[in-house]
Amino acid sequence: MALIIEKFSFGVGDRFAHQGKAQLAAIVKAAEQGVEVVPVWNKSNREHQTIGSEIASCRQAADAAVKALDWNKSHYVDAYHINLKIVDPFLDNSDFYTIDVADAIGTPAEESEVNAFVDSIPELIGSLDIPGIDQPLEMTRESIVKTANHYLKAVQLAGEIYRYIADKNGEGTFITEVSMDETDSPQTPPELLVILAAIAKQGIPVQTIAPKFTGRFNKGVDYVGDVAQFEKEFQDDLAVIAFAVKKYGLPENLKLSVHSGSDKFSIYEPIRRALKKTGAGLHIKTAGTTWLEELIGSAEAGGDGLDLAKEVYAEAFANSEALCAPYATVIDINTDDLPDPETVKAWTAEQYVNALRHDPNHPEFNSSFRQLLHVGYKTAAKMGDRYLKMLVKCEESISRNVTENLYERHLKPLFIDQ
């Protein structure tokens, strides 16, 4: 029987493999409120390389958390942002694959392949009524060719990666996500429909898809953009997915995936409204927010924990250019707002926590400070055992913050009636 992901799934990241139990505790709390959300632990190849962790460690930590909390529902391990070059080491430990074809978006496929694909979907040419979208979609052969030129090559690559994994691990043994979010502008409903048709033609049993949304999804901070426009795009995407599932025989549980979804408080209510209205499912990835709760918990514990949290910031500040470079498109740091490390050295635990904890209404909250630390996990990785020992020493404080952050600020506003 094929592996089918549940309606609501929640991507969690545990960079240093110490917070699995605390993360799962938040999911358990949601279950106690009658909301079934399943955890998906995800860690990219880049994160493994930065930290120096073994790929198997993600599965080991997830399984240990599940055993410790006696969790008897599903859980998954996501090989996040994989491509053909790096997939092999993930094959033994993953049952969810986020196929990243960003590099192929915008690269035209062969003209003959584009024409053959467009010829295979004549039903999309003309005026198309999609239930849930106010206006009919107007599509011409020319507009479909244009979309195919931009995305078909990427979908073909996704098909190649999917078939490689299926050949190695067996069909139906894993969840497939196709990531289309790393492109310049959001896909329009006609574009998303063409992409989904192409995915169906490739025979990819896609269960989650990550389109590009309007606005900025910066790391660890709130959504920046037009919330009303986001809500319209989100609802339109849900409508297109429902239509494509029926039209092209895609998996019935196909749902949207929101990347960099942690801390996007402004859009949680619009997402919840849309899910309630349509009955749709959701996958949301919240990887990096937990590492910041480790720093908050360490600082809150005071003493050595606070000293170490200050040291992490001082190192991140000194190496900010190198740390920020790989994340340049998904951070927005005002260097004038970054406090001098000497100033931070004199802070109390409360001052450090207030600057870092994501409470946008708190007068001491510092978005730039938070974003720099978000991308600065490499500084903690370089500390090696010293950092890991601090996680153990400050476990009570850290666990409490990790669970509270995921439950109160993420799961509750997204899935639980207030």
Please describe what each predicted stretch is.
Residues 77:
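Active-site cofactor/substrate anionic-group-binding motifs, chiefly glycine-
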Residues 80, 178, 259:
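Conserved, mostly hydrophobic/aromatic
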Residues 2-63, 67-69, 85-105, 110-113, ...:
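Active-site capping/gating regions of soluble enzymes
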Residues 172-176:
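Short, conserved phosphate-binding/catalytic loop or strand-edge motifs used
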Residues 180-182:
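Short, well-ordered beta-to-alpha junction loops that form the rim of enzyme active sites
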